[in-house]
Protein backbone atom coordinates (compact mmCIF):
# COMPACT_ATOMS: atom_id res chain seq x y z
CA UNK A 1 0.00 0.00 0.00
CA UNK A 2 1.15 3.53 -0.66
CA UNK A 3 2.32 5.69 2.20
CA UNK A 4 0.16 8.72 3.01
CA UNK A 5 1.50 12.06 1.86
CA UNK A 6 2.30 14.74 4.41
CA UNK A 7 -0.01 17.72 4.69
CA UNK A 8 2.79 19.78 6.22
CA UNK A 9 6.44 20.53 5.54
CA UNK A 10 8.98 18.82 7.77
CA UNK A 11 12.45 20.18 8.56
CA UNK A 12 15.26 18.87 10.74
CA UNK A 13 17.55 21.52 12.25
CA UNK A 14 20.95 20.22 13.36
CA UNK A 15 23.56 22.26 15.24
CA UNK A 16 27.23 21.49 14.73
CA UNK A 17 28.41 23.84 17.45
CA UNK A 18 26.09 23.68 20.45
CA UNK A 19 28.73 24.25 23.13
CA UNK A 20 31.19 26.49 21.26
CA UNK A 21 31.50 30.25 21.27
CA UNK A 22 31.88 31.00 17.51
CA UNK A 23 28.63 31.77 15.74
CA UNK A 24 28.89 29.40 12.78
CA UNK A 25 26.81 26.27 13.22
CA UNK A 26 24.51 27.52 15.96
CA UNK A 27 20.74 27.19 15.70
CA UNK A 28 20.21 30.96 15.99
CA UNK A 29 22.16 31.44 12.75
CA UNK A 30 19.85 28.98 10.99
CA UNK A 31 16.75 30.65 12.42
CA UNK A 32 17.93 34.07 11.24
CA UNK A 33 18.38 32.70 7.72
CA UNK A 34 14.88 31.20 7.84
CA UNK A 35 13.38 34.52 8.90
CA UNK A 36 15.37 36.44 6.28
CA UNK A 37 13.82 34.10 3.68
CA UNK A 38 10.31 34.65 5.07
CA UNK A 39 10.06 31.13 6.49
CA UNK A 40 8.06 30.35 9.65
CA UNK A 41 8.12 27.33 11.97
CA UNK A 42 4.72 26.60 13.50
CA UNK A 43 5.71 23.68 15.74
CA UNK A 44 9.16 22.79 17.04
CA UNK A 45 10.02 19.55 18.82
CA UNK A 46 13.42 19.88 20.52
CA UNK A 47 15.22 16.60 21.16
CA UNK A 48 16.76 17.89 24.38
CA UNK A 49 17.22 15.10 27.00
CA UNK A 50 14.13 16.01 29.00
CA UNK A 51 13.27 12.56 30.35
CA UNK A 52 14.01 11.69 33.96
CA UNK A 53 13.49 8.01 34.86
CA UNK A 54 11.71 6.74 31.72
CA UNK A 55 11.66 8.00 28.15
CA UNK A 56 8.82 10.48 27.75
CA UNK A 57 8.06 10.81 31.48
CA UNK A 58 8.89 14.53 31.36
CA UNK A 59 8.46 17.22 28.73
CA UNK A 60 9.38 20.88 28.87
CA UNK A 61 7.34 23.74 27.44
CA UNK A 62 9.65 26.51 28.59
CA UNK A 63 13.02 27.32 30.07
CA UNK A 64 14.49 29.91 32.39
CA UNK A 65 16.88 32.52 31.06
CA UNK A 66 20.61 32.62 31.78
CA UNK A 67 22.60 35.71 32.77
CA UNK A 68 26.28 35.33 33.67
CA UNK A 69 28.82 37.76 35.00
CA UNK A 70 32.50 38.10 35.82
CA UNK A 71 33.20 40.40 38.76
CA UNK A 72 36.59 41.75 39.80
CA UNK A 73 36.70 43.12 43.34
CA UNK A 74 39.69 45.45 43.58
CA UNK A 75 41.78 45.80 46.72
CA UNK A 76 45.34 46.80 47.59
CA UNK A 77 48.09 44.19 47.48
CA UNK A 78 50.72 44.04 50.21
CA UNK A 79 52.47 42.08 52.95
CA UNK A 80 50.28 40.23 55.46
CA UNK A 81 52.33 41.70 58.33
CA UNK A 82 51.16 45.24 57.47
CA UNK A 83 47.33 45.09 57.52
CA UNK A 84 47.09 48.86 57.75
CA UNK A 85 48.66 49.11 54.28
CA UNK A 86 46.45 46.61 52.45
CA UNK A 87 42.83 46.22 51.41
CA UNK A 88 42.00 42.53 51.26
CA UNK A 89 39.43 41.83 48.50
CA UNK A 90 38.79 38.37 49.94
CA UNK A 91 37.41 39.85 53.16
CA UNK A 92 35.25 42.40 51.35
CA UNK A 93 34.01 39.73 48.93
CA UNK A 94 33.02 37.46 51.81
CA UNK A 95 30.58 40.12 53.03
CA UNK A 96 29.33 40.64 49.48
CA UNK A 97 28.75 36.93 48.89
CA UNK A 98 26.87 36.60 52.17
CA UNK A 99 24.47 39.38 51.22
CA UNK A 100 23.97 38.13 47.65
CA UNK A 101 23.24 34.62 48.92
CA UNK A 102 20.51 35.94 51.23
CA UNK A 103 18.55 37.78 48.51
CA UNK A 104 15.23 36.38 47.29
CA UNK A 105 15.33 37.47 43.66
CA UNK A 106 11.71 36.50 42.97
CA UNK A 107 9.14 33.91 44.03
CA UNK A 108 8.80 32.12 40.69
CA UNK A 109 5.36 31.29 39.29
CA UNK A 110 3.19 28.36 38.22
CA UNK A 111 5.47 27.62 35.27
CA UNK A 112 8.94 28.29 36.68
CA UNK A 113 10.84 27.80 39.91
CA UNK A 114 12.27 30.98 41.47
CA UNK A 115 15.31 32.68 40.01
CA UNK A 116 18.54 31.22 41.39
CA UNK A 117 21.94 32.82 41.91
CA UNK A 118 25.08 30.67 41.96
CA UNK A 119 28.81 31.37 42.09
CA UNK A 120 30.78 29.03 39.85
CA UNK A 121 34.38 30.22 40.25
CA UNK A 122 36.45 32.33 42.65
CA UNK A 123 40.10 33.16 42.00
CA UNK A 124 42.45 35.29 44.09
CA UNK A 125 45.96 35.36 45.51
CA UNK A 126 49.49 34.79 44.26
CA UNK A 127 50.00 31.39 45.87
CA UNK A 128 52.27 32.88 48.53
CA UNK A 129 51.28 32.70 52.21
CA UNK A 130 52.57 36.16 53.07
CA UNK A 131 50.96 38.28 50.34
CA UNK A 132 47.50 39.84 50.48
CA UNK A 133 46.05 39.80 46.94
CA UNK A 134 45.11 42.94 45.07
CA UNK A 135 42.11 41.51 43.25
CA UNK A 136 39.49 38.77 43.53
CA UNK A 137 37.74 37.46 40.43
CA UNK A 138 34.34 35.82 40.76
CA UNK A 139 32.22 34.18 38.06
CA UNK A 140 28.50 33.79 38.71
CA UNK A 141 25.22 32.96 37.02
CA UNK A 142 21.53 33.73 37.31
CA UNK A 143 18.96 31.23 36.04
CA UNK A 144 15.99 33.56 35.91
CA UNK A 145 12.29 32.98 35.43
CA UNK A 146 9.76 35.23 33.73
CA UNK A 147 9.21 37.15 36.99
CA UNK A 148 12.64 38.78 36.61
CA UNK A 149 14.49 40.34 33.72
CA UNK A 150 18.05 41.23 32.78
CA UNK A 151 17.80 44.89 33.83
CA UNK A 152 16.29 44.09 37.26
CA UNK A 153 18.96 41.49 38.08
CA UNK A 154 21.83 43.75 37.03
CA UNK A 155 20.41 46.71 38.93
CA UNK A 156 19.87 44.72 42.14
CA UNK A 157 23.31 43.09 41.97
CA UNK A 158 25.18 46.32 41.35
CA UNK A 159 23.19 48.11 44.06
CA UNK A 160 24.70 45.67 46.58
CA UNK A 161 28.18 46.41 45.25
CA UNK A 162 27.66 50.15 45.62
CA UNK A 163 26.06 49.75 49.06
CA UNK A 164 29.23 48.02 50.26
CA UNK A 165 31.34 50.76 48.68
CA UNK A 166 33.42 48.33 46.65
CA UNK A 167 35.79 49.23 43.87
CA UNK A 168 35.03 46.78 41.10
CA UNK A 169 34.88 45.89 37.42
CA UNK A 170 32.10 43.76 35.98
CA UNK A 171 31.24 42.15 32.64
CA UNK A 172 27.82 40.68 31.87
CA UNK A 173 26.77 38.04 29.31
CA UNK A 174 23.12 37.28 28.53
CA UNK A 175 22.99 33.85 26.90
CA UNK A 176 19.25 33.29 26.86
CA UNK A 177 15.88 34.80 27.79
CA UNK A 178 13.08 32.78 29.41
CA UNK A 179 10.54 31.31 27.02
CA UNK A 180 7.19 29.59 27.53
CA UNK A 181 4.80 27.87 25.12
CA UNK A 182 1.31 28.80 26.29
CA UNK A 183 -0.75 27.53 23.35
CA UNK A 184 -2.10 24.05 24.07
CA UNK A 185 -2.45 22.31 20.70
CA UNK A 186 1.11 21.03 20.15
CA UNK A 187 1.54 20.19 23.83
CA UNK A 188 -1.63 18.08 23.76
CA UNK A 189 -0.51 16.21 20.64
CA UNK A 190 2.82 15.29 22.22
CA UNK A 191 1.21 14.23 25.50
CA UNK A 192 -1.20 11.99 23.57
CA UNK A 193 1.65 10.47 21.55
CA UNK A 194 3.63 9.64 24.69
CA UNK A 195 0.54 8.04 26.25
CA UNK A 196 -0.20 6.08 23.09
CA UNK A 197 3.31 4.60 22.85
CA UNK A 198 4.32 4.21 26.51
CA UNK A 199 1.03 4.01 28.41
CA UNK A 200 1.93 6.80 30.83
CA UNK A 201 1.32 10.53 30.79
CA UNK A 202 4.32 12.87 30.90
CA UNK A 203 4.63 15.58 33.51
CA UNK A 204 5.51 19.14 32.50
CA UNK A 205 8.67 20.45 34.15
CA UNK A 206 10.47 23.60 33.04
CA UNK A 207 13.61 23.18 35.13
CA UNK A 208 17.16 22.61 34.01
CA UNK A 209 19.46 24.74 31.92
CA UNK A 210 18.90 26.66 28.73
CA UNK A 211 18.23 24.89 25.44
CA UNK A 212 18.14 25.67 21.73
CA UNK A 213 14.38 26.06 22.06
CA UNK A 214 15.00 29.66 23.15
CA UNK A 215 16.14 30.57 19.63
CA UNK A 216 12.73 29.67 18.19
CA UNK A 217 10.73 32.04 20.40
CA UNK A 218 11.47 34.97 18.07
CA UNK A 219 9.26 33.22 15.49
CA UNK A 220 6.38 32.73 17.88
CA UNK A 221 6.68 28.97 17.38
CA UNK A 222 5.01 26.43 19.68
CA UNK A 223 8.03 24.73 21.28
CA UNK A 224 8.09 21.49 23.26
CA UNK A 225 11.16 19.59 24.42
CA UNK A 226 11.05 15.80 24.49
CA UNK A 227 14.13 13.62 24.34
CA UNK A 228 16.11 10.81 26.00
CA UNK A 229 17.10 10.45 29.65
CA UNK A 230 19.25 13.20 31.16
CA UNK A 231 21.00 10.94 33.69
CA UNK A 232 24.44 11.14 32.06
CA UNK A 233 24.39 14.55 30.36
CA UNK A 234 27.78 16.32 30.48
CA UNK A 235 29.31 13.37 32.35
CA UNK A 236 32.18 11.12 31.34
CA UNK A 237 30.84 8.28 29.16
CA UNK A 238 27.63 10.16 28.36
CA UNK A 239 25.31 7.66 26.69
CA UNK A 240 21.79 6.82 25.49
CA UNK A 241 20.48 3.25 25.39
CA UNK A 242 19.33 1.81 22.06
CA UNK A 243 16.09 0.70 23.71
CA UNK A 244 15.34 4.27 24.76
CA UNK A 245 16.09 5.51 21.25
CA UNK A 246 13.64 2.98 19.85
CA UNK A 247 10.92 4.17 22.25
CA UNK A 248 11.66 7.77 21.33
CA UNK A 249 11.45 6.93 17.63
CA UNK A 250 8.01 5.43 18.27
CA UNK A 251 6.82 8.58 20.04
CA UNK A 252 8.14 10.85 17.30
CA UNK A 253 6.57 8.71 14.58
CA UNK A 254 3.23 8.68 16.38
CA UNK A 255 3.38 12.47 16.71
CA UNK A 256 4.09 12.99 13.00
CA UNK A 257 1.19 10.70 12.07
CA UNK A 258 -1.08 12.43 14.57
CA UNK A 259 -0.25 15.87 13.18
CA UNK A 260 -0.81 14.60 9.64
CA UNK A 261 -4.28 13.31 10.46
CA UNK A 262 -5.24 16.61 12.08
Where do the protein language model's features map onto the residues?
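Acidic/histidine-rich catalytic neighborhood of metal-dependent amide-processing enzymes
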Residues: 1-62, 260
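Metal-dependent amide/peptide-bond hydrolase catalytic core
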Residues: 49-54, 61, 67-262
Amino acid sequence: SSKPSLNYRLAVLLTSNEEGEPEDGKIDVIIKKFMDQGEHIDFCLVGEPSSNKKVGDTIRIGRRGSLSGTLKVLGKQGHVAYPEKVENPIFTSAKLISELESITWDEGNEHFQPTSFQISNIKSGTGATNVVPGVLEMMFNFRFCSESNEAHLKETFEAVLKKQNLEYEIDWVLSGLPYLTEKKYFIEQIVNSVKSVTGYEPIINNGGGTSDGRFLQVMGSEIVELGPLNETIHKTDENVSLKDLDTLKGIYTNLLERLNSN
